[in-house]
Design a protein with these regions (language model features):
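PAS-family sensory domain signal
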Residues: 12-66
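A general structural signal for short secondary-structure boundary/capping elements
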Residues: 41, 110-114, 141-144
């Protein structure tokens, strides 16, 4: 795609970047995409701004993001990431967890993602949206 320079590790993200940029301009939710082979990720500008994240394609986003997740919610996050990136599951349920925002307060997010597979059934792209859960009544504090 013209105007986008990428390393070979960025693969599918670089190819999808113009579409990703268009979507982030029209979506009020936070969006993300992860190349399942290279583990490179890209997040929307709004997500990067609200949570002090690196902009552009990041090579260690998954670990960086985990560091922002509330300690009580990290295991649930790890299990979700393992289901997608290690086990290659495409039927993952939505996950709700707390993340430390730019100003230091924790906010509840609901993450919904799906896996795109190649012709041989191998996962190549994990993409989705995250939404803030503003009202306390939206989250069951016992089950998350």
């Amino acid at each position: 795609m013209e105007g986008y320079k990428s390393s070979p590790a960025e693969g599918i993200l670089a190819k999808s970047r113009p579409l990703f940029d268009l979507l982030q301009q029209t979506c009020s939710q936070y969006i993300f995409a992860c190349d399942m082979q290279s583990r490179c990720c890209i997040v929307s500008e709004k997500l990067a701004e609200d949570f002090a994240l690196p902009r552009g394609i990041s090579h260690d986003f998954i670990n960086f993001w985990e560091g922002l997740i509330h300690p009580e919610d990290r295991q649930r996050y790890r299990e979700s990431i393992k289901a997608v990136l290690v086990e290659g599951r495409s039927d993952i349920p939505d996950i709700v967890y707390r993340v430390k925002a730019r100003r230091g307060e924790y906010v509840w997010l609901q993450c919904s993602g799906r896996v795109r597979c190649n012709k041989s059934g191998q996962g190549v792209l994990f993409a989705g949206v995250m939404s803030k859960l503003v009202q306390k009544g939206k989250v069951d504090m016992l089950t998350g």
